UniProtKB/Swiss-Prot annotation:
DNA-binding region(s), residue ranges: 27-53, 81-104
Region: Disordered, residue numbers: 107-129
Assembly description: Homodimer. Interacts with AS2, WRKY1, HIRA, a probable histone chaperone, and RIK, a predicted RNA binding protein.
Domains: entry comment: A C-terminal domain (245-347) is required for dimerization.
Gene from which the chain derives: RS2
Keyword DNA-binding: yes
Domain HTH myb-type stretches: 1-53, 54-108
Organism: Zea mays (Maize)
GO biological process: asymmetric cell division; defense response to bacterium; defense response to fungus; leaf formation; negative regulation of DNA-templated transcription; polarity specification of adaxial/abaxial axis; proximal/distal axis specification; regulation of innate immune response
GO molecular function, one term: transcription cis-regulatory region binding
Protein name per UniProt: Protein rough sheath 2
Length: 370
């Protein structure tokens, strides 16, 4: 479709020239007025101008302050991007909506990654001794399930195969080794009884049953371990007596320990993610509080300016009223003085007339006497 094609620089230049000459309106007349075959409809021209070519639009990614502002406004207004864009200068509603979709998808992906269990560690990561011990225990339990359940026979394991933290040459370890070498008829305790001992410290065991040498030799032959009967019923120097069921329990404990470690690692990652979210929320709240304080300060300043303007207007109004009152008083006084002056002038004129009448009558009287 033509509307989906990428805009070319010459088309943008045509739109800019059209807006400079005719203003951002009547987009359906662009081709007619500019005498250019612009294969774009009016809506496409409007969207191009409003979202990309309009002066004042910022290009590039959002800054951290703009991101915090958009997150706060989205929590306040929802997905009303036109209202949000009105409060974020230089950004359009379309740009903010796309940024929010990418931000939300990134958050969901981080949450899924934090809840996903960690991958299975390689033998190098788990450790050489742990890997050997676990594989040997699984092989032993898998090939001899019935023999381990009916009558567990003692096996001899070389001491170097065990990890260093299982090695011990103390007296209690020797007693534990003797107890493992001659278990009672009932199954052993669920707790792991595994230790190392030497032949010099461990006491000699009693005579084994008639069937024990042949069965022990047959059991130990497939794995390459010598049987106790080959050494007179006692463990050779540097060897440890290990019970098959105890070894399986040890492997199970190791697996449980590894599962606990993985769960702890997952919990730690989730806690770190939650802590990061809390820090972001606190930062947003601090920025919001700072903005609210600034807005409150600006509101107070505007109120003080309005009060100052109102007070100045009141003073000016009182001044105008007093000046008008003084002018009225002066005019009244002037009118009164004019009236008084007119009255005095009338009296003087009357007096002059009276004086003129008296002089005429006096002159006529004198003429008659003569």
């Amino acid at each position: 479709m033509k509307e989906r094609q990428r805009w070319r620089p010459e088309e943008d230049a045509v739109l800019r020239a059209y807006v400079r000459q005719y203003g951002p309106r009547e987009w359906h007349l662009v081709s007619q007025r500019m005498n250019v075959a612009l294969d774009r409809d009016a809506k496409s021209c409007l969207e191009r101008w409003k979202n990309y070519l309009r002066p004042g639009i910022k290009k590039g990614s959002l800054t951290e302050e703009e991101q915090r502002l958009v997150i706060r406004l989205q929590a306040k207004h929802g997905n009303k991007w036109k209202k949000i864009a009105a409060e974020v200068p230089g950004r359009t509603a379309k740009r903010l909506g796309k940024w929010w979709e990418v931000f939300k998808e990134k958050q969901q992906r981080e949450l899924r990654d934090s809840r996903r269990p960690p991958p299975e560690p390689s033998p190098d990561e788990r450790g050489r001794y742990e890997w050997l011990l676990e594989n040997f225990a699984e092989k032993l339990v898998g090939e001899r399930p019935q023999q381990a359940a009916a009558a567990p026979s003692p096996l001899l394991m070389a001491a170097p195969v065990l990890p260093p933290w299982l090695s011990s040459n103390a007296g209690p370890a020797a007693a534990a080794a003797a107890a493992v070498a001659h278990p009672p008829p009932r199954p052993p305790s669920p707790s792991v009884t595994l230790s190392l001992a030497s032949a010099a410290v461990a006491p000699g065991p009693p005579a084994p049953a008639p069937w024990m040498p042949d069965r022990a030799a047959a059991d130990a032959a497939p794995y390459g371990f010598p049987s106790p009967s080959q050494h007179g019923g006692a463990a050779p120097p540097g060897m440890a007596v290990v019970d098959g069921q105890a070894l399986a329990e040890l492997a199970e404990c190791c697996r449980e320990l590894e599962e606990g470690r993985r769960a702890w690692a997952a919990h730690r990652r989730e806690a770190a993610w939650r802590l990061k979210r809390v820090e972001q929320q606190l930062e947003m709240e601090r920025e919001m509080r700072r903005r609210e304080v600034w807005e409150e300060f600006e509101a107070k300043m505007r109120t003080m300016r309005l009060e100052q303007a109102a007070a100045a207007e009141r003073v000016e109004r009182d001044h105008r009223e007093k000046v008008a009152e003084l002018r009225r008083d002066a005019q009244v006084k002037e009118e009164k003085m004019a009236e008084q002056w007119a009255a005095k002038h009338a009296r003087v004129a009357k007096f002059v007339e009276q004086m003129g009448g008296c002089s005429r009558s006096w002159s006529s009287a004198t003429d008659m006497n003569c």
